[in-house]
């Protein structure tokens, strides 16, 4: 008899202000310092640095998308906890809110001589544009 049961694990996403998401999930794709990192049930233990980017969470009921900025992930065989400096639930972000956030960040970057940070933020904007199908119009 074939086992078609999907293995789930506990995923927790926490910001400095509050817990953002805690649920049994199928998989999570994290933006780590070494590239995209896919976490599934029974993953080998790992601690990873989280960078500016998009975090995809696959649940039994669908996909959730978060925009995150900096943090750390603690991955065990039974779960994954991610503490991030900043997080936005992309499904709850209106187009107007996104435009305003982009304008504020771009204004802050004007005159910034740190090319590394500028490139990371440009990459992040590109990722948000690619993932804008999940954004909700206000």
Curated annotation (Swiss-Prot):
S-S bonds = none
**Entry's Pfam families?**
ATP-synt_DE_N
* Entry's Gene Ontology cellular component terms: plasma membrane; proton-transporting ATP synthase complex
Q: Where in the cell is it found?
A: Cell inner membrane
* Swiss-Prot/TrEMBL keywords: ATP synthesis, Cell inner membrane, Cell membrane, CF(1), Hydrogen ion transport, Ion transport, Membrane, Transport
Keyword Thylakoid found: no
Q: What is its main location?
A: membrane
Q: How does it sit in the membrane?
A: Peripheral membrane protein
User: Does Cell membrane appear among the keywords?
Assistant: yes
Question: Signal peptide location in the record?
Answer: none
The Swiss-Prot or TrEMBL record annotates one GO molecular function as: proton-transporting ATP synthase activity, rotational mechanism
Complex formation: F-type ATPases have 2 components, CF(1) - the catalytic core - and CF(0) - the membrane proton channel. CF(1) has five subunits: alpha(3), beta(3), gamma(1), delta(1), epsilon(1). CF(0) has three main subunits: a, b and c.
User: What is the purpose of this protein?
Assistant: Produces ATP from ADP in the presence of a proton gradient across the membrane.
Please report which protein family the annotation says this sequence is part of.
Belongs to the ATPase epsilon chain family.
List the protein's name.
Answer: ATP synthase epsilon chain
Q: Source organism lineage?
A: Bacteria, Pseudomonadati, Pseudomonadota, Alphaproteobacteria, Hyphomicrobiales
**This protein's encoding gene:** atpC
